[in-house]
Every structure is written in structure tokens, then in C-alpha cells.
Amino acid sequence: MTAELRNLPHIASMAFNEPLMLEPAYARVFFCALAGQLGISRLTDAVSGDSLTAGEAPTALALSGDDDGPRQARSYQVMNGIAVLPVSGTLVSRTRALQPYSGMTGYNGIIARLQQAASDPMVDGILLDMDTPGGMVAGAFDCADIIARVRDIKPVWALANDMNCSAGQLLASAASRRLVTQTARTGSIGVMMAHSNYGAALEKQGVEITLIYSGSHKVDGNPYSHLPGDVRETLQSRMDATRRMFAQKVSAYTGLSVQAVLDTEAAVYSGQEAIDAGLADELVNSTDAITVMRDALDARKSRLSGGRMTKETQSTTVS
């Protein structure tokens, strides 16, 4: 396993005391798995006080099919004129790979593939094939804005296949149109943060940590003591502000009101429920997604061509 994947201090620095946009069940799996690696003996839900237990990790699904052209020059498949961009696993700020890699996808890779597809003459539209519980806040909003920017160049659709939660929902909201499968899990428009406290464990081992610092907030949220009330309030305010920013983005992209988005209270929706909540547009079988998008693009092209022909005919008649 590479150093990048086993750099536990780096992983911990991104997982703790940082806002995350994760589907709740996946968050439990994630932190329970990470706890075993970091020697954390107990995980507690700060809201309910319950201990967290791990469930089953999500399984990635992806569309498959023949590429319209040679793949070596592209970082995505082109199927019937549609660039298919897989977005699976945990979403992180950046990775070394453009494609999903070792259970995660980098926002930097999504942006790079979007920009390449937007300028590809063989691509008429872009489909984000998504199976993600969400991930890091860092980079998510910028990535969503790029999706919204690219959709003004070429249609960008999102397919929840079979999960599209939290940060994934943010990205999907920025798309021109959102498809969901009948069992797809979507929504979870909220933010969370975890704080770790190693103080008791270190004391049992006879280890005492002394923090020497300058600046009253320099060691806020440090993992060697309980979280003080005032620091927790500050972190809670940060979560609330990020959640509101999340809701504002979804509102701007989808046309839903900010209050309607906030009123979801980070609920997770399944299939048709997402359409009823205004977070998705159409229920499809994942194997039909390419055909559905292709038919829509052809119909749009036909309408535009018909409109141009009508104007040209009128112009000729007037002349």
C-alpha cells in the first residue's frame, strides 16, 4: 500500500475538526474504520450520546459499454456522443488520479475531466455517473460551480447510481438535469464534524502532552483534552454557516427556495422521494440512462433546428 494511502496523520487531519458532507450511515462506517487504525476505542454521537457502530460499506456501481473512440486520449468514456464521468466513493479535495481511485474521487479530477469533455468535439453532453456518500467540504463548492459553468457550454446530467448524498448532492444539484434509480439514495444536505479526544488513553499509557502556544485560539479543538463549551459553540456556528451555504448553492442551482432546502433537515431520500422533494427530475433504470439522455439531446437539437428553419423561411418570405 502506498504512503499516500497509509499517511494516517494526514488522513486524521482531514477527518477530524474539519467540516464534512457525508451521508450519515457512511459516516459511521468511515469513522469506525478509521478508529481502528488510529487506536480510538469509542465513538460517540454528540447529539444522541449513542456509541457509533459500523454498517456495511457502500458498493460502487458504474455504467459500462463500448467507447465511441480511443480511450487513451481521454480520461472518460464516450458512449453515443455522451461523456460518462464516474464519480464514486469518498469525495476529497484532490488526488493524483483523474478517475476514481482506491475508493475515492478527487474534485480536481472531476474538474479536469469536465473541462476536457467540454472542449471535446466528439462529446455532445456529459453524464456524471455518481455513487458517492459525499466527502470533504474543501473543494466541493468550487467543483459544483465548475459543473454549473460547464452546463452553459454543454448539457451536464447527473445520475444517482446508486447513491448521491451530501457533497454528492451538491455536485448533482449543479447539473442541468438529475436522474435517479428507483433505489438511489440522495439528499443529506447537511454538514458534520468529528472531534477526537486521546487524553484518557494517553494518560493510561503514562503519556502527558504539553501544548505550548501563542494565540488564545491556536489549540482550539486539540485531541488531548475534552472539547470546551465555547470552542464547541464556535465549531457549531461554523457547521451552521456551512450548511446554509450548502442550501444557498442547491437553491441557486435547482430553483428550490433556501428554506425548502433547509427544511429537509439533511434527510436522505430514496428513488421517487427525491423527485417529490425537488432534488431530482426523473426516475430511470441505470442501464437506460445513456439512451434517455441521448434522446433528450436529439429532441433538443431537433427543436432548435426547427426554430432556425422557421425563422429562415419567414425571412425569405418577407424578402
Please place each PLM-identified region on the residue numbering:
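N-terminal organellar transit peptides
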Residues: 1-319
